[in-house]
Amino acid sequence: MNRFQLLSKGLRLIHKMSEEALAGVPLVHISPEGIFKYVMINVIDGGDASKAVIRGFADCTWHADIFEREEEVFKKLGLRAECPGGGRIEHNPDKKYLKVYGYSQGFGKADHAQTKRILATKYPDYTIEISDEGY
């Protein structure tokens, strides 16, 4: 094998590994209950593949805290992350209810309709409401 073939084979292997890493990223990771900030994150592998995920944690004061925490996780997997926006989530597991609303002052408003679709993959038996009202 010449250098070009070795390089090409190595790049294909790296790309396959990043595709597998992307496939392993959960679509939803949010706090089990309460009202908290959330961000939508576009997770991107080394090529053109990407997926939008939802992250929201009650222990994070700022939307940027959530993004920075998750960005580090994705970097360790060889993935990039971009944040198109955020908002708030009200999570009531007893009532099987989620409400998505508001916006992030730093990142802007996430697409709440898309957020609802993503949340429904993890919470198919929940009532999920979206609103553009409130902060």
Swiss-Prot record:
Binding site for substrate: K37, S104, Q105, G106
GO cellular component, one term: cytosol
One MF annotation (Gene Ontology) recorded for this entry: protein histidine phosphatase activity
InterPro entries from the UniProt entry: Janus (IPR007702), Janus_sf (IPR038596)
Top-rank taxon, per record: Eukaryota
Keywords: Differentiation, Sexual differentiation
The keyword Transferase belongs to this UniProt entry's keyword annotation: no
Gene3D superfamilies in alphabetical order: Janus/Ocnus (3.50.20.20)
BP terms from Gene Ontology: cell differentiation; sex differentiation
Record: active site: H63
PANTHER family: BCDNA.GH02250-RELATED, JANUS-A/JANUS-B
Family to which the UniProt record says this protein belongs: Belongs to the janus family.
Record's function text: JanA and janB regulate somatic sex differentiation.
Protein name in the entry: Sex-regulated protein janus-A
